[in-house]
Amino acid sequence: YHRSGKGVLVTTTTHMYVEADTDLSCDFFALRDKIIKDGYCMAGQKISEQSKPKMCGLPYDLLDRLIKDMPQALDYVIIEADGAKHHSLKYPAADEPVIYPLTTDVIIVLGTWEKGKLCKDVVFRYELMQNELGMAEDVVVDDSVIDMLRQVYVKKLRDSGFEGRISTYYR
């Protein structure tokens, strides 16, 4: 989006690793100025000082204010909502996905590069998936497993009251 001249803010609802040039100030004016100047800003709150620092998302009141006060400069807010801890696929926990209340569109990203491998080796929270769905130990990732995970996410989103658009990106 940024390459097409659109103003973009990127954050998370839970936590993620801090990328280079991420703004961790949680300062409205600093974030506003960066979006206006650069057309792009990744932002959050720092939560760890480890060798690879992590951040959590912007406070919702700050996110609300940025969206409300910057309609001329902020075209898209992209919020990572449910990471898979470096796995290609994930089975969501009971309280996931966590989405920002004013979300209009959700893109479910599903990794397809590990088809043919055992689910237990590539699905984050496989044990939960196995317990809830009664899957056998030797189930292999194929299109039906990937589609089942997509359906689980869609159901959880709809059950949570999300009425916006849901699309899927197969990576």
Model-derived segments and their meaning:
Residues 2-53:
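N-terminal phosphate/diphosphate-binding loop that engages ATP/GTP or pyrophosphate donors
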Residues 8-12, 42-45, 77-81, 87, ...:
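General beta-strand structural signal in soluble alpha/beta enzymes
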Residues 13, 81, 111-112, 132-139, ...:
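G-domain G4 guanine-recognition motif of GTPases
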Residues 26-35, 121-140:
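Acidic, Ser/Thr-rich peripheral helices and adjacent loops at domain boundaries
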Residues 48-91:
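Phosphate-binding/switch loop-helix module in NTP-utilizing enzymes
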Residues 83-86, 102-120, 136-146:
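Conserved Switch II/interswitch segment of TRAFAC-class P-loop GTPases
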Residues 93-115, 125-132:
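Inter-motif core of Ras-like GTPase G domains
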Residues 140-161:
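A short, acidic, amphipathic alpha-helical segment used as a generic capping/interface helix at domain edges
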